[in-house]
Amino acid sequence: RDEVAKAGITAILGAGFDPGVVNAYARLAEDEYLDEITSIDIVDVNAGTHGKWFATNFDPEINFREFTGVVYSWQNGAWQTNQMFEVPREWDLPVVGKRPTYMTGHDEIHSLSARYSQADVRFWMGFGERYVQVFTVLKNLGLLSEQPVTTAEGQEVVPLKVVKACL
């Protein structure tokens, strides 16, 4: 941030949707539509299906890694921590209807909380019941670990990479 300011240029954080477009929408809302921002809740949910018994929405290794750590949110002017799937919330959304979501950590929470420190900033992601169940079993069995293990045949494998290969 300091280097960007010193250079007199504007840096774009993320080129995707979240972070990226979400940050631009927040700034647009601040500049054009709202007198005060007290909370920012980003809801990432869809009604899609992969037609498979189980699938992730994007690269399984990245997807699982994102959800095995601590969930951070910015609330009441301070960082709050939770475990994945600890804080549920149902949203009733246009087009997709009622969908269960869980508070999840995500990159834009950090950038938005820096600009809107007075606001609660949370990220919610939709997961179906099957996803939550499969994720929980894989995690409890140690299959989402990035630490190598040695098989009975003496081969060293990383459980998370094996799960990814199987999906």
Residue map of PLM features:
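Short alpha-helices
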Residues: 12-25, 30
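C-terminal catalytic/substrate-binding lobe primarily of soluble NAD(P)-dependent oxidoreductases
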Residues: 32-167
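Short gly/pro/ser/thr-enriched loop/turn and capping motifs at secondary-structure boundaries
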Residues: 1, 18-21, 43-50
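Rossmann-fold NAD(P)-binding glycine/threonine-rich loop
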Residues: 1-11
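Fold-independent oxyanion-binding glycine-rich loops
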Residues: 9, 14-15, 45, 76
